[in-house]
A protein has these predicted regions:
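Glycine-/small-residue-enriched transmembrane alpha-helix faces in small-molecule transporters
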Residues: 2-51, 87, 158-185, 206, ...
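Juxtamembrane helix-entry segments on the extracytoplasmic side of multipass membrane proteins
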Residues: 12-18, 42-50, 74-80, 152-175, ...
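Transmembrane alpha-helical segments that form core, pore/gating elements
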Residues: 21, 36, 60, 120-122, ...
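Helix-helix packing/entry segments at the starts of transmembrane helices
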Residues: 25, 51, 108-115, 180-205, ...
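Specific transmembrane alpha-helical segments of multi-pass solute transporters/efflux pumps
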Residues: 27-32, 61-113, 123, 149, ...
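Hydrophobic/small/kink-forming positions within alpha-helical transmembrane segments
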Residues: 29, 86-91, 95, 117-122, ...
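Specific alpha-helical transmembrane segments that line the substrate/conduction pathway
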Residues: 47-58, 89, 94-136, 172, ...
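Hydrophobic transmembrane alpha-helices of multi-pass small-molecule transport proteins
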Residues: 60, 83, 123, 132-154, ...
């Protein structure tokens, strides 16, 4: 233990953990870039997320099997929780995110999703009456001001589509925040890896069923580029970052891993500019600084009553 009472991390674990957390955050951020590239080939959100989940399903089933070895059998209550979390945390959050990316830039999408810790804070207050400190309130206001700054700039040239896209992505962030708030009990009982493997597998199946219900089978005929981009999305930007972040948390703890995630919005903006030729100007810089600073303060000061 350190003098401050926090657990000390061996230098080797600290370096490896920071590297894993950074790589995982960058890989997660690449998802929006790949989705935007795929949309250039005339595919829609329902079909695109179907292919992403089709290729991700075997990986998460394998993770669920590996994490379940020697573990107790799941009860009906466990399965109900897994299905519920799969719907909110992975199916609904993913679909709304993909849909929203049809209308807004990858940079704005990542900034909205990065508000997630503030949404968890608000849900904690609404559901459990956990107090929000004055510092956290100011930090949240700063974060949302940053998003509004970038949104206002984007709405000037995207029009009503920017409003729809931003609302869809914000809905995705809320859905994932609900998952985080309610997943605590199951994480303790099942373990993080087992829960992620099972809940994501549920979401994968739901995305496949959604395609069958909403689209003719002929809609599955897409450009080869969409297939390869979906494989890349499922592996490099979905499965791999989950593993990397979990390994990082084991080495450096959830708090430091979350703070390292600040690299996510910046990497998305950089990739958006370099790969998608998205705009980069003072509005985006200022908005990003506000969002990242506000979320850092929220995570830095923690949630009262959550420990």
């Amino acid at each position: 233990m350190s003098a401050s009472g926090a657990p000390a991390h061996p230098p080797s674990h600290l370096a490896t953990g920071l590297l894993l957390a950074s790589a995982g955050s960058i890989a997660f951020s690449g998802k929006a870039i790949i989705v935007k590239l795929a949309y250039r080939h005339g595919v829609d959100a329902v079909t695109l997320i179907m292919y992403r989940m089709l290729f991700a399903l075997p990986l998460f089933l394998g993770l669920a099997w590996w994490a379940s070895r020697g573990a107790p059998r799941l009860s009906r209550h466990d399965w109900a929780g897994i299905v519920g979390l799969g719907v909110t945390g992975y199916y609904l959050a993913s679909f709304l995110d993909f849909w929203g990316l049809e209308y807004i830039s990858a940079s704005l999408e990542r900034l909205i999703l990065y508000l997630n810790p503030t949404l968890v804070l608000v849900l904690g207050w609404l559901l459990y009456r956990r107090r929000i400190s004055a510092m956290q309130g100011v930090a949240m206001a700063v974060s949302y001001a940053g998003v509004l700054l970038v949104f206002g700039h984007e709405a000037d040239f995207a029009g009503p589509n920017a409003v729809l896209g931003a609302l869809l992505v914000f809905g995705s962030a809320v859905s994932y925040a609900i998952y985080l708030v309610y997943s605590g009990e199951l994480v303790k009982r099942l373990g993080a890896m087992r829960l992620v493997g099972l809940a994501t597998s549920v979401a994968c199946v739901l995305c496949l069923l959604q395609f069958v219900l909403l689209r003719p089978l002929s809609a599955a005929v897409v450009a080869p580029e969409v297939i390869w981009l979906s494989v890349l999305n499922a592996t490099l930007c979905t499965f791999a970052p989950v593993i990397m972040v979990m390994m990082a948390i084991e080495r450096i703890g959830a708090g430091l891993a979350a703070q390292t995630g600040m690299i996510g919005p910046m990497s998305t903006i950089a990739m958006g500019v370099l790969i998608l030729d998205e705009a980069f100007n003072a509005w985006i810089v200022a908005g990003t600084v506000l969002v990242v600073s506000g979320v850092f303060l929220v995570t830095r000061f923690g949630t009262p009553g959550s420990r």
